[in-house]
Amino acid sequence: STFNSVVYFALNYTQVINAVLVLAAIPAATIVLSSLMKIEKTNIFQLFGLLLSIIGIGSIISNGDIQKIIFLNFNNGDLWMLVCVITWSLYSTLLKKHKFKVSQFSLIQLMVSAGILFLIPQFFYEKSIGLELNFNKAFFLILFYVVMFPAIAAYYCWQKGIEIIGPNRSTMFIQLMPLFSAVMAIIIFNEKFELYHFVGAIFILTGIYLSNKKTQ
């Protein structure tokens, strides 16, 4: 709940391009944490794959214009995004470090219950400053989507992935988010497919492939 809440809060103060660039640091932070906690060793393929995937993300979110990244202005929202990076990396690393004696779905139930308790004070705080929810059809459709997919399906798959291949290799797949977003924008909003989309996709997919290789 901390990760999701802080992401939504940070986006009020920073650009999407800044947020995505900061989130691209999650695999690097996870590699550092898993090494410090002696959970998983890092190899040269993972480091090179991480570098390639970050280049690919930069290509997509900057529309192939490096000037957009060079002249970015960072702000308080970006600092909050760094909090997201730390919390998600720590969460992913601890999932591998501690073997929970409950099923994946039971663990998700515990997380959701704890998350609700954490979010209640935030709800009343926002209400106190005049932010109100509109309980209309759109609200309930969005709520259904968030509960069924990001809150249950995604967390289940994420936990299962870390259990099988470990945090270092799992977090590399986060780099696919900008690529999937670009593909969905092309399909749903009829945005034009550009060369930088192709270049970014090649770099990201190559980076993920390399990160899953093992040294001999």
Language model regions located:
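Alpha-helical transmembrane segments of compact multi-pass small-molecule transporters, enriched
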Residues: 22-36, 51, 112, 116-117, ...
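Specific transmembrane alpha-helical segments of multi-pass solute transporters/efflux pumps
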Residues: 1-18, 22-23, 59, 147-165
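Hydrophobic/small/kink-forming positions within alpha-helical transmembrane segments
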Residues: 1, 5, 27-32, 86-89, ...
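Membrane-interface helix termini and inter-helical loops of multi-pass transporters
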Residues: 9-12, 61-74, 124-138, 142, ...
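Hydrophobic alpha-helical transmembrane segments of multi-pass integral membrane proteins
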Residues: 47-55, 76-83, 91-149, 176, ...
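Residues that define the loop-to-transmembrane-helix transition and helix capping
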Residues: 17, 43, 103-104, 168, ...
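Hydrophobic transmembrane alpha-helices of multi-pass small-molecule transport proteins
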Residues: 42-64, 175, 184, 196-215
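Hydrophobic/aromatic residues within transmembrane alpha-helices
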Residues: 10, 36-38, 42, 98, ...
